[in-house]
Amino acid sequence: MTTLNRRTFAHLSTMSMLTAASRKLFGSIEAPSIFSQGGEMRVQGQNYIWEYSQAEDTVRLRDSQKRIIVDGKLQPAVIVAPAHDASGRLCTPGKVSGCHAERDRVTIEYEKVNGGARVSVTWRFDEHGIWLEPVMYETPTAEDVVSLHYFSEVNEASHQPSLHSTYLVVPGISEGSSVSPIIRDYMHLNQSVWLGRGSFIPGLNQQWGLPLHYFCGFSIDSSAGLRNMYTKGRSEAFTCGLADLPSGDLFLNLYQGKCSPWIDYRSDLWKHVRGPGKLSLGATLLWSVAPDYYEAIATYYRSLREAGVIHVHQNSPRKTAVSLTPQFCTWGSQVDENKEQERLDEAFLNQTFQALKASGLKPGLFSIDDKWEGAYGNLEHSTTRLPHFEQFLDKLREEGYLVGLWAALMRCERPADIGLTEDNMLKRPDGTPYLAKNSGTTHYYILDFTQPAVAKVLSDLVRKFIRRYKPDLFKFDFGYELPAASIAAPQDKRWTGELLMWKGLDIVIKAMREENPDLVVMYYQLSPLFLDYFDLHSTDDLFLAAGEYDLEANRRIYFSSLFGPLGIPTYGSSGYDWASAPSIWFDSAAVGTIGSLNDFREDEQGEANTPEFVAKYNGIAKTLRPTNIFNIVPLGAIPEAPTFGAHAHSWARIEDGQLVLLAFRPPVPGDENLLASERIDPRFEDVVRSTVPVVVASRGRSSITRDGKLAIVPYGEDKITIRRELGERAKMISHYFGGTVTQDETLIQGGWLKVNAVARSAEGKPLEWIEVQIS
């Protein structure tokens, strides 16, 4: 890629740079070319080579330098149960019976699968990427499909994953930070993990990021020795993700350094995917290739958008403003003070609100968490624990706060309360209703919203909820509680698997928005296929990262920042201690908004809020940008590192080609990791000079080198130097905790603005932010 000087960068849009880079690397955009000879297939794309060998039944993806990215056996394993014996299992491989190419696709056919069935697998190639279409399974036998396993090594005794890349990248692989999403093949992490919506089943605890609906990988070549293994020997990266939703649960099976995406149908239990006949199994998978996995995910998202599968989130000004409002959530105080779930009461809410105001923290939105309801599913407040709940909400609004409310909409504690019965709940295979339990003592059912009567009741309930309580933000929390197909299912089996969550969202979110089109719905998923239903991404919940909440939040922001071009900002909630919160707010500044869960007395580490913590929150709040569509450039990542990987040292935010925010952490002498790629990207080098971490943001629409108003939040005392292309004079207004303000003026000399950041006022109050007015 051609190096851009500083002046060129200031006037080029990000899109034009990416386009120029693509043309430089790949030439003009042309349709992929397909070559076939003697059972060998090869497809030449703009930045990849796709290969298939009929003799080995192996598919291989290479990058433009012909380095292997990923390869594996192509034939999928289809596990079936005879219709007369639900406990029986059959999975035997077939033989390749045909391999042919058409203008834009390659189809491989297999015969004698599971005895007498036929399977066909079709790959399609276009300007958007590589598409693996649903698997066609044609069987003459009365049998139920139990599961479908892509890229499997199948023999008469077993089937195992065969897809191999040296590294796999699986965001959301664990709710905690102890399992890295960057997995080397030698780790031999033998585990099936959710790529779909998630549920409480044996295995790794997963929640944040789900549904994910994709995974990534790249490879290294050490065949000639280890020299340059991670430079010249490192391949580009792939992302493989859903382009539509399957009617089964989506998992990724990891075994002995290889993997296999697989879909669990469990028709042996539910009799809904049954032969004889021709069955469409799986889903459409889109593959993208890019220089690294961050760009490969971005390309996957962008290709879905360009193909018309998804679209950019378009908000009203009101919705965008609510999305980006700094938040305070009661949940951290609830768990610190043992006031979660049925112990949440009116005294606690009043006490917390008074403590918030006394602290000096200045959020614009007050969010009330679990359990303000009297019973799950009723969507009405507890009249015994919270008798004046609606008056409390009115008080919040009178004092200028927006209101956020948490709910797990599909829970139902007492069906009769809402005019339903146990027959309207999800059922187990034996016909009994599925009963779930939260971390407290409450048991509850899960509504079967595929039943029209239940859908109407649920729709009416959420409409009434919106009309009565008038939340500005709805904190949705539920997907992980939908039971797996192996445990329970709805009455209408057309809506099993990943489609079940989509069906529920389509009912409740549509009904809510018909009552309030500007309602902001917040959730923590990373799938692009649910973007129509969510407006704000959340990094919650960080509870399994005690002692390093900031590190885990940084990693989650790294992945969620890719939603910026699609119009979804991120809410950077704190963890459960005050000490890590300023770092989380620093990392959140570029991607959306900030929040706090922290208790105002003592947190889990025995710390309380201080003016210094509060000043950082209030200061970062002044740097937040007012738009929901943006691009992020994470700086300082080490792609292959399990710990340092998928982390950014600094962040640059681009809007309409302009650098409008830079969250800059300078290298620390003696502590700098020299392996970090582009710690100071040449596009942003020397825009800001500082020896302390600092966030510099435009307050208008122009870049920080040209805008007439800036907001600066230094994390320490220093002279901050900012390159300027416009302006001669600057007025600097320093805002301190408690309201003290000082002013200074300076000349802009030689294209540089020098701002003296004084950490404390004469009275000893900590600095919140520096307002700069340039003329």
Sequence positions of predicted segments:
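N-terminal secretory signal peptides and thylakoid transit peptides that target proteins
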Residues: 1-16
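C-terminal beta-strand-rich structural cap/linker in extracellular carbohydrate-active enzymes
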Residues: 711-723, 748-775
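Active-site-proximal substrate-binding groove within the catalytic cores of carbohydrate-active enzymes
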Residues: 272, 276-288, 500, 504-721, ...
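C-terminal segment of N-terminal export signals and the immediately downstream linker at the start
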Residues: 21-42
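Solvent-exposed beta-strand/loop surfaces of large extracellular or lumenal domains
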Residues: 732-757
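Carbohydrate-recognition beta-sandwich/jelly-roll modules
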Residues: 43-364, 473
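Aromatic- and carboxylate-enriched substrate-binding clefts and catalytic-loop regions
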Residues: 173, 363-579
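Conserved, mostly hydrophobic/aromatic
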Residues: 328, 396, 661
